[in-house]
Amino acid sequence: MAPERSERSGLQALDQGLVDQVDVDADPFVREAVRDLQQEVAAARAARQAEAKFEELRRESGLKLNLGCGADVRVGWVNVDLTVGNGSGEAATGTKVIEFDLRRGLPLAGDSCALIYSSHFLEHLEYRHGIALMRDCHRCLERGGLLRLALPDFRLDLHAYLSGDWGYVAEFDRIAAPDFGEGFELIRGMPPELRGQAMADYVNFFIYQYGEHKTIYDHENAQLMLEHVGFGSVQRSSHREDLDGSDEIRQKYSFYLQALK
């Protein structure tokens, strides 16, 4: 137990004392670095707090996982994300909500899952973390278990850019306005009078999303990744409302892959 106590005290020292030790007001770049470090400390703390919930699942089988769930907490599923957006609890039978950093893999038993689903999450991970997570998904799935991925179809964005299709931008703007503001009001650091003037600015949002997107996928490189980690049957799929929901922006701007173990 001594190493665990040492780790805990070390994290507490970082979390509580770092800002006091650094003159963060002197340099905005230092402030950003401190915030990044605090986020990593918070992720480490969340991983520790999640241990008990994962331990409860170690002897379970036939699990359904929803990875990177955000606010999409599904009844009867194990819903995992670093921050679960709507604060939903676990009142429904068989429903689990676990706040956990999926860069750390899946602390579940092998062959314990019947279905693993993830929508618009994998692109938020660096490639090295994404492929490691997919390898762990393969390990955790039972034989014949299904992995289903929904990912942003960046080809649509790039085609619109190359063809100068402002109609595509206007349609996306209409659908996305409730989440991102009309005219992508949240393009950070851009003077208001410049917003919406150049299509490349929209492409910056589509591809990078304020730096949150780390990796671009298409059918080809996602399929190659899944095959590399052991999936033997990887197929393109169309939208399935029973699994993918009815959100318009996800329906129109996603591609889907599913793979069997």
Describe the function of each predicted region.
Residues 1-65, 137, 232, 238, ...:
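Non-catalytic N-terminal targeting/anchoring module and adjacent flexible stem/linker
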Residues 29-36, 70-74, 212-218:
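Short low-complexity stretches enriched in small and charged residues
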Residues 36-39, 47-53, 69-70, 88-90, ...:
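N-terminal start-of-chain detector that recognizes signal peptides
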Residues 53-55, 68, 87-88, 106, ...:
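Short, flexible, glycine/charge-rich loop motifs used to bind or transfer phosphoryl groups or to couple energy/partner
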Residues 60-159, 220, 257-261:
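Conserved SAM-binding loop
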Residues 129-142, 146-260:
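S-adenosyl-L-methionine-dependent methyltransferase catalytic module, highlighting the catalytic core
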